[in-house]
């Protein structure tokens, strides 16, 4: 049948012929099911749906007394696709993705903080009130800034993306500073009552660096000795060669008696 392969569509007919010819003793159990629900016979593949990014904004429209909620659809550029990529599923994008990328590009060290990745439904952020940044039962992290910025964009009239980002970032810095102060005060109070703490992370890192440097210095010394031995095997001992040169130079300077 040309380039089309109908083997999968005719699996029931093949099973019936094999049973009639005696190749199989009993018909398969799925024979009646395939007869009731036959395979699809559509030979034309449809292209995947294009997902559009929808944004919610609160804007003051001309002639309106109060701000109204407006839904904006981001226009996507139509790019010609290769034949091999024509039927691939399209990428699903959310507005939070762009906000998250911008925040972690400006604050890469926030990714080094420990985070809780366990979620019940994947929509845990919807159970918080993001009219404020700090939430009870949730640690302050970069995702809090993203959700706070998104809440400002969806609820504050005529606010820009950069303005919402500045507001959320300023609140984030203030809470981070408050956490650092509380941590320092708690450590000072504990030390005042007799508590002792081990070395800090910086001290541990410096100790590991010193150990690595000492290990490298011993390795470099051994390598230098091996290199000197290889050189001496071809040119002789450097002390003997230096002594011979000194003797020759002295003989040239001192006149030989007649």
Curated annotation (Swiss-Prot):
InterPro entries for the chain: Ribosomal_mS23_fun
Location within or outside the cell: Mitochondrion
Cysteines engaged in disulfide bonds, as pairs: none
Domain of life: Eukaryota
One Pfam family matching this protein: MRP-S25
Annotated GO MF terms: structural constituent of ribosome
GO cellular component, one term: mitochondrial small ribosomal subunit
Keywords: Mitochondrion, Ribonucleoprotein, Ribosomal protein
Entry's family note: Belongs to the mitochondrion-specific ribosomal protein mS23 family.
Subunit structure: Component of the mitochondrial small ribosomal subunit.
Protein name as it appears in the record: Small ribosomal subunit protein mS23
């Amino acid at each position: 049948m040309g380039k089309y392969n109908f083997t999968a569509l005719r699996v029931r007919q093949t099973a019936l012929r094999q049973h009639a010819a005696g190749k199989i003793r009993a018909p398969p159990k799925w024979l009646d099911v395939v007869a009731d629900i036959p395979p699809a016979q559509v030979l034309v593949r449809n292209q995947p749906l294009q997902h559009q990014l929808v944004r919610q904004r609160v804007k003051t429209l001309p002639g309106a007394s109060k701000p109204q909620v407006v839904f904006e659809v981001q226009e996507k550029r139509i790019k010609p696709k290769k034949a091999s990529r024509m039927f691939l599923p399209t990428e699903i994008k959310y507005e939070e993705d762009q906000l998250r990328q911008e925040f972690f590009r400006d604050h890469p060290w926030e990714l080094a903080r420990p985070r809780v990745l366990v979620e019940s439904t994947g929509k845990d952020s919807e159970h918080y009130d993001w009219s404020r940044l700090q939430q009870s039962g949730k640690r302050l992290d970069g995702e809090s800034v993203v959700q706070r910025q998104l809440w400002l964009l969806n609820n504050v009239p005529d606010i820009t993306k950069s303005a919402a980002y500045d507001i959320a970032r300023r609140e984030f810095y203030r809470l981070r500073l408050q956490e650092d102060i509380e941590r320092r005060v708690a450590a000072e109070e504990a030390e005042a009552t007799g508590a002792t703490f081990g070395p800090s992370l910086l001290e541990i890192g410096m100790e590991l660096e010193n150990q690595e440097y000492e290990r490298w210095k011993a390795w470099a010394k051994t390598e230098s000795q091996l290199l000197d031995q290889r050189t001496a095997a071809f040119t002789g001992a450097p002390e003997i060669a230096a002594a011979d040169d000194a003797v020759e130079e002295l003989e040239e300077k001192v006149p030989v008696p007649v």
